[in-house]
Amino acid sequence: MVVEDHADTLRVLARLLDHFGHEISVADCAQSALEIVESKEFDVVLSDIGLPDGSGYEVIAQAKRKQPIKGVALTGFDKEEDIRRSKEAGFDFHLSKPVDFHELCMILTQAGS
């Protein structure tokens, strides 16, 4: 699942991931993401941190309470404290925007194994 409030970024990520054979669901806010997590199972959640109705921290914490899942933070926040906070919230990986798609693909491969 991809959780991103910026429509263009969400569209590009969804197309690229689909092109490389990943099944995806998309959400543009925390509430939508949490509703989707209630009804579907995922291997990985890719989530922005800053969402209009909450945060990616909340999304990954609640998603991990529902199912065994890997989390990838996709964010503009790239300081050491931001990375630490992502890990504490439950993210397994932290990628700073702009995201290197090859790095993201390697992480998805690692997360899926």
Each predicted region: which residue ranges?
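The feature encodes the CheY-like receiver
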Residues: 10, 52, 79
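Two-component/phosphorelay signaling modules centered on CheY-like receiver
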Residues: 7-25
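C-terminal output helix
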Residues: 14, 81, 99-108
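Short hydrophobic/Thr-rich beta-strand motif most characteristic of the beta2 strand and flanking loop
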Residues: 21-29, 36-37
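Active-site beta3 strand of CheY-like receiver
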Residues: 40-46, 51
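Acidic catalytic/metal-coordinating carboxylates
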Residues: 29-32, 55-58
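Alpha4 helix (beta4-alpha4-beta5 surface) of REC/receiver domains from two-component response regulators
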Residues: 58, 78-94, 106
